[in-house]
Amino acid sequence: MDETRPDQECGGEYAGGGPQQLVDMGSATIKTERGTIHTLTIVGQIEGHQLLPPNAKTTKYEHVMPLLAALEESDEVDGLLVLLNTVGGDIEAGLGIAELIASMTKPTVSLVLGGGHSIGVPLAVSAKRSFIAPSAAMTIHPVRLNGLVIGVPQTFNYFERIQERITQFVTRNSKVDKETFTRLMLQTGELAADVG
């Protein structure tokens, strides 16, 4: 953090009460004459109920969700800018974060830089205004699972319900209709071309 800029603060605090370093939380509150905007970065994988390896770049939902609640209730913050560069991750955690952003009464803007893949799509459209950089990419794909599947019919039904939750969220928070979103999600030729 630049100590010569008193109008820029870092998000979060240590238990001791001092400001938490920007590199720790990836967020900053920027004060200008026009208002106070909190920037939040969502990068790497969205970490949910399973811990990811310590060398993986992650966004932890247990850090982001209370921060979003605090921002919504704060009289000192006028709006939220979400900077996204994520490969996706935990569906439940990603949808939880997206629902919180979508339910905020303050102005919210999302900007996809690099990538907004998988569960990053609902996160991208959760803000009241969403933008994607010309050099960025987004991947829409059906819900998938790594590992052993026991009870295939039950697992398939569960996947269908999760996919429907994602589809409903995206169509409710964007201008895409269900048929178009489903068609894009199932274009396996496009996905193969995108990821090689």
Model regions and ranges:
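Structural motif
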Residues: 39-41, 79-83, 111
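Glycine-rich beta-to-alpha active-site loop
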Residues: 83-97, 102-147, 191-192
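Charged, glycine-interspersed solvent-exposed loop segments at helix/strand-loop junctions
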Residues: 80, 141-196
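Extracytoplasmic/secreted proteins, especially bacterial periplasmic and envelope-associated proteins
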Residues: 63-66, 96, 161, 165
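STAS-typified acidic loop motif
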Residues: 4-5, 17-62
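Soluble non-cytosolic domains of exported or imported proteins
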Residues: 58-62, 91, 153, 157-161
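A short, well-ordered alpha-helical element
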Residues: 52-78
